[in-house]
């Protein structure tokens, strides 16, 4: 109940709605569908369409090899399967995801500084970089969403340790790594930090194995 009282629910809805309105407005007035296949975006679109049609993950021009990770193309393939090969549908889904990210970032701030949810959530909602990237077929929006959830559950675990919170934190970090490799080395860092925490807390080996 700590995380879901009425005030937090109202703030969550407010931040989400403001973020969604801003991102929807940007997408409606400033995004040309033809722009969504330019440069790196075209490569992701091609991979997503290929997965949706064949179920195989490879670049059509290079045989069964790819310089991309499978997370984001699979995300695109799911959208193409559900809504057809409509790149604006991708933008719509990403505007929703990015609006949720603003809420998650606000919750992260709240776990560190009480009463900061609204301020930090609104800063995220108004963040021009986030707004622009939500309207591009690139990994940024999906990765930030997944990585933010990892941080949120990591903070929740540190405050009130529970195996489910640890499992969710590690799972979202692993999924985020399938979207962008930048978080790959954090997996080992997280394990190291957990060990340090257990040592500082003087937790016995039996309890460490139980938590892990």
Feature-to-residue mapping (PLM):
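Short acidic/glycine- and proline-prone juxtamembrane loop motifs at membrane-interface regions
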Residues: 129, 135-143, 179
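Transmembrane-helix motifs of polytopic, lipid-linked glycan transferases
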Residues: 92-114, 145, 149, 153
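Short helix- or helix-capping micro-motifs
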Residues: 19-22, 120-128, 132, 152, ...
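Loop-to-helix entry region of an early transmembrane alpha helix in multi-pass inner-membrane enzymes
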Residues: 70, 74, 84-103, 133
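Transmembrane-helix signature of polytopic, membrane-embedded enzymes
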Residues: 105-126, 144-145, 160-168
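Short hydrophobic alpha-helices at membrane interfaces in multi-pass membrane enzymes
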Residues: 153-174, 206-211
């Amino acid at each position: 109940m700590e995380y879901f009282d009425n005030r937090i629910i109202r703030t969550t809805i407010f931040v989400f709605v403001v973020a969604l309105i801003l991102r929807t407005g940007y997408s409606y007035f400033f995004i040309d569908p033809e722009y969504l296949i330019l440069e790196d975006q075209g490569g992701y679109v091609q991979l997503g369409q290929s997965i949706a049609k064949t179920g195989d993950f490879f670049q059509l021009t290079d045989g069964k090899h790819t310089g991309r990770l499978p997370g984001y193309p699979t995300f695109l393939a799911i959208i193409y399967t559900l809504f057809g090969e409509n790149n604006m549908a991708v933008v719509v889904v990403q505007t929703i995801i990015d609006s949720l990210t603003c809420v998650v970032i606000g919750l992260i701030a709240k776990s560190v500084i009480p009463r900061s949810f609204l301020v930090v959530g609104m800063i995220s909602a108004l963040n021009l970089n986030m707004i622009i990237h939500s309207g591009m077929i690139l990994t940024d929006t999906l990765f930030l969403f997944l990585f933010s959830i990892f941080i949120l559950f990591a903070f929740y675990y540190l405050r009130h340790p529970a195996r489910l919170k640890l499992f969710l934190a590690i799972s979202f970090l692993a999924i985020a790594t399938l979207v962008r490799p930048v978080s790959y080395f954090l997996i080992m860092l997280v394990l190291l930090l957990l060990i340090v925490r257990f040592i500082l807390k003087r937790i016995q080996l039996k309890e460490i194995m139980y938590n892990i």
